[in-house]
Each structure stands twice: as structure tokens, then as C-alpha cells.
Amino acid sequence: MYERDYGNMLHLVSGVYIPFDIKWKNIGVSVSGGADSAMLAYVLCKLITENDANTTVHIISHIRMWERRPWQRKNSLDVYDWLVGHFTNITFKRHENFISPDLEWGSQGATLIDEYGNINSGDIIEIQSFAKYIAHRENQDINYNAVSHNPSTLEIDNRFLRRDIVFDDSEKTRNLIIRKHGDRYSCHPFRFEEKKWIISCYKLFDALDLLDVTRSCEGDNIDYPDVFKGLDYKSYKDDMRVPTCGKCFWCRERDWALTCD
């Protein structure tokens, strides 16, 4: 049914359907600086190039946890610069948003009601709202997000349970991949793909140099002072080499994916 409803815009990429209409003039992609969002942006740029589409790519990045992890802005800029340098045929625009640490899920939890009537955290509402604003301002046809599925063969504490849902071709799960909001689409094409598939794409497309630019670690001096040794917004400089903790969910997920065939 998924193929029936969106068949005219589906492109098979390493066994996974990626919705993209070559007639679209403006697309938005959330890019954090991590491996998942960087690969999604890469795949979309690849489709634009292969189909000679006249599509502007709007990269949306959020400054988050700026006091604890000030390097995250540099991570997203590094990915953006890589994309611009490698896809010189494409017009890019970057849009940067700021999210107060006080609104993050880790600070307050899910305490607010979003526009769809769901209980959500402030950061999620802010991300959705900013994407909607940019989509309207830039007349975007679709906005993409690279949220992926939890590892199926790795037990990790603090996993996000909403990433465990299984695709069953119901309307509910199809809507988690792509759905229409008014005149525009919202799309999570990696929603049911694990990070091992995403890492395999880096190998398949010979884009390991892009993977090297990305950062998955969500650790910082508060949680792992033995690793970060006091590093925060007061001492961080953009030319610093920032360590990875190797212990957080995101580090362990990435390490697991890199060892998968």
C-alpha cells in the first residue's frame, strides 16, 4: 500500500524506498551533525544529482545544549560544508535555530501539548514549529528528518522506546514515514531502518570521509567528567579535538553498527 500511494515519487536506495519528487523545487532536511542526518542529506543530494532536478536543499540545524555541548554547532557546520563542497551542482541554504536547554526533554520531560494535541517536550515542539516556519517561508515541498530504528540485536539502557515500533503497513506506521500536512509533506524515510543500514550506505557510496566528519556522541562533562575533563562552553574552542565518551546510547549504537556486516 505504501508503494501504491507514493509509487511515483519512490526511489529504491540500497533496498529502502526514499520519497523524492524530481519536480520539487525546495526541500528541507534536518541536519544535526550526526551520521543519520548526514546520510539522509547525502542520499537526497545524490537523487537530485542523478535526476538532474532543480531542487534547492534547505539544511535546518538546531543549537542545543550549548553550555554542555558547545561543539555541536561546529559538527553541523562541518557536515554542511562537506555537502556544499561535494555537490557543487546544488543550491544550499542553511537555517539555524536555538533551543533553550531549559526546554529539552532531559530537563523537563514531556509536559506540553503540541499543535496535534500530543503531550511533548519543549524541544520537540520547538523543532517541529521551526521546521513548519521555514517550510512556509521558503515554500518547501517537503521536510525530512532522519530519525531511525533502535538496534534489534543490541540491548542498550536508555533506548528511546518509540524507536522500537515495527512497520506493519498500517496507516499509522506509514504516516511515521511520510504524511501530508496541507500542501507539504513530512518525511522520516529511515524510521524503520537501523543504524547498521545507515553505516552500510556510507560504505556502499564510498562516503566514509563524510562519516568521519559526523559525531554521534551525546556525552559531556556532566555525565562523563573523566572523559571530558571540564570541557564546556567556557573552555571549548572550535579547533579543539573533542573526545567521545564511548558509553552513551549513541556511541554504543554507532560502535555496534560499525561492527555489523
Residue ranges and their predicted role:
Residues Y2-D261:
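Nucleotide-activated chemistry modules centered on ATP-dependent adenylation/adenylyltransferase
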